[in-house]
Amino acid sequence: MSKVCVLTGKRPKYGNNVSHANNHTRTRFEPNLHTKRIWIEEERRWVKVRLTAKAMKIMSKTGTAELAKLLK
């Protein structure tokens, strides 16, 4: 399963860990993904999606209608 948010489209980014001695080590910064079951009222069913914490915050404000459009 890919590490991409369904709603925001966030995906892993690459960069460097920099130590106190200024040594650079390549690393992969993962999005803060969570698997959630969400009730879609229009379709009267549960949907299992992987969302970032920011996407869950957006959904709590706007509702599940936006997610339902993306899943169709």
UniProtKB/Swiss-Prot annotation:
Keyword terms, alphabetized: Ribonucleoprotein, Ribosomal protein
The keyword Ribonucleoprotein is assigned to this record: yes
Domain of life the protein comes from: Bacteria
GO cellular component terms listed in the entry, alphabetical order: ribonucleoprotein complex; ribosome
Keyword check for Ribosomal protein: yes
Example GO BP: translation
InterPro entries: Ribosomal_bL28 (IPR026569), Ribosomal_bL28/bL31-like_sf (IPR034704), Ribosomal_bL28_bact-type (IPR001383), Ribosomal_bL28_sf (IPR037147)
GO MF entries: structural constituent of ribosome
One Pfam match: Ribosomal_L28
PANTHER family hit by this protein: 39S RIBOSOMAL PROTEIN L28, MITOCHONDRIAL, LARGE RIBOSOMAL SUBUNIT PROTEIN BL28M
Assigned protein family: Belongs to the bacterial ribosomal protein bL28 family.
Protein name: Large ribosomal subunit protein bL28
Organism (species): Chlorobaculum tepidum (strain ATCC 49652 / DSM 12025 / NBRC 103806 / TLS)
Gene coding for it: rpmB
